[in-house]
Design a protein with these regions (language model features):
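Membrane-interfacial terminal anchoring regions of lipid-handling membrane enzymes
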Residues: 1-128
């Protein structure tokens, strides 16, 4: 109930879970070992899932189970961009990046997994 959900937590969760669902027959270890070209997500799919998860997080906030940072009130496009910029900002390599064609990619599935974990215990998987 004192967990604060940041935009960086949300975008990491969304990206990792989209990839995980795509490879649902794989173990987490196998997913973490996927080649980079298998770990991309389209901006359109990302935004759809982002909104779905954000809506569910708002319900959890109303139920006093979590606290949402003010970033989560931003319009979808801005929330996505802010979250992507912030996730893993203390690391020398990007965790998530969006290219000019709207493809979201990661350089490190392990870091993405690490940052996604903050939201992994809230039963959000069914909304992916």
């Amino acid at each position: 109930e004192n967990t604060v959900v940041l935009s960086s937590n949300l975008v990491a969760y969304v990206a990792f879970q989209i990839i995980r669902k795509r490879f649902n027959q794989f173990t987490v270890f196998e997913i973490l070992s996927l080649p980079k070209d298998e770990t991309t997500v389209s901006e359109i799919e990302f935004k759809i899932v982002l909104d779905r998860i954000r809506d569910r997080l708002k319900v959890l906030e109303e139920d006093k189970k979590i606290i949402l940072s003010s970033d989560l009130d931003l319009p979808t496009e801005e929330l996505m961009n802010v979250g992507i910029k912030k996730v893993g900002s203390s690391h020398p390599t990007y965790v998530l990046r969006k290219n000019k064609n709207g493809v979201i990619s990661t350089r490190s599935m392990k870091l993405l997994y690490y940052y996604h974990n903050k939201l992994s215990s809230y039963g959000l998987d069914e909304y992916i």
